[in-house]
């Protein structure tokens, strides 16, 4: 719950804000996803959050990453599929939550996200590619069972 409430806390906060004085943005991260990292920094250094699971759920809620924990997956999927989103196949992806495992939903959502980004509609983050490759392997392994 804490991660869900705080995941976008730094979304509109400039990197020059006093609350982010010690924050160093990671390399190779497009501007639209920087807030996930600055948000985790803000949660830890301003609000005193120490729970690694909460911090990771904030830190990777936009890009994903390989081998995410349950809280990370839930925040990622909730953020991507929230009621205010309106993009092709969003209803189908939401239905996945009721019908499939979190890992399968991660695979499908990351696949959609990569297609969108590769079509030139946004900057691609290496973490998203790594996350997709990880969940694609799980998807393939589950299909062979």
Per-segment meaning from a language model:
Residues 102-120:
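Long, amphipathic alpha-helical surface segments
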Residues 115-145:
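Charged phosphate-binding loop/patch that engages nucleotide di/tri-phosphates or the phosphate backbone
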């Amino acid at each position: 719950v804490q991660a869900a409430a705080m995941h976008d806390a730094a979304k509109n906060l400039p990197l020059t804000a006093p609350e982010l004085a010690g924050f160093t943005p990671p390399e190779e991260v497009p501007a639209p996803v920087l807030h996930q990292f600055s948000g985790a920094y803000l949660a830890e250094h301003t609000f005193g959050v120490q729970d690694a699971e909460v911090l990771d759920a904030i830190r990777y809620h936009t890009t994903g990453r390989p081998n995410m924990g349950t809280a990370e997956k839930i925040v990622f999927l909730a953020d991507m599929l929230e009621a205010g989103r309106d993009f092709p196949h969003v209803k189908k992806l939401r239905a996945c939550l009721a019908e499939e495992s979190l890992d399968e939903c991660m695979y499908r959502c990351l696949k959609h996200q990569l297609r969108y980004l590769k079509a030139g509609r946004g900057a691609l983050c290496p973490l998203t590619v790594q996350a997709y490759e990880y969940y694609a392997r799980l998807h393939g392994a589950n299909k062979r069972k």
